[in-house]
């Protein structure tokens, strides 16, 4: 039994949102760079090759692999300088990413607090 399985999954999401934040900031920094193409970091959850049986329809499926990919968008709105970065879109994505980061952090802290209470033998 892996007591930290949930925390480790949140750790992956927290690290992902941190890396994505840096990519989005790079887009903002290059908003005026000619021929710059916007980038984004996306992730995939690869399902297991053997389907797992769940006892409830709301159970989360087990995933084998968490994979990140850096995507370069070659299409989209482009100015005369062939740059496709929209400052408004990047700021919007940064805010959404920040909220995701904070949410994953709160979930991870909640899981750790629960484990701490269990270890100490308190059910508060």
Curated annotation (Swiss-Prot):
Keyword Secreted: no
Claim: Hydrolase is one of the keywords in the record: no
Biological process annotations from GO: bacterial-type flagellum-dependent swarming motility
Annotated compartments: Bacterial flagellum basal body
Record GO cellular component, one term: bacterial-type flagellum
Main location: other
InterPro entries membership: FlgB
Keyword set, alphabetical order: Bacterial flagellum
Family to which this protein belongs: Belongs to the flagella basal body rod proteins family.
Subunit structure: The basal body constitutes a major portion of the flagellar organelle and consists of a number of rings mounted on a central rod. In Gram-negative bacteria, at least four rings, L, P, S and M are present, whereas Gram-positive bacteria lack the L and P rings. The rod consists of about 26 subunits of FlgG in the distal portion, and FlgB, FlgC and FlgF build up the proximal portion of the rod with about 6 subunits each.
Entry function: Structural component of flagellum, the bacterial motility apparatus. Part of the rod structure of flagellar basal body.
Record-given protein name: Flagellar basal body rod protein FlgB
Organism: Aquifex aeolicus (strain VF5)
Lineage: Bacteria, Pseudomonadati, Aquificota, Aquificia, Aquificales
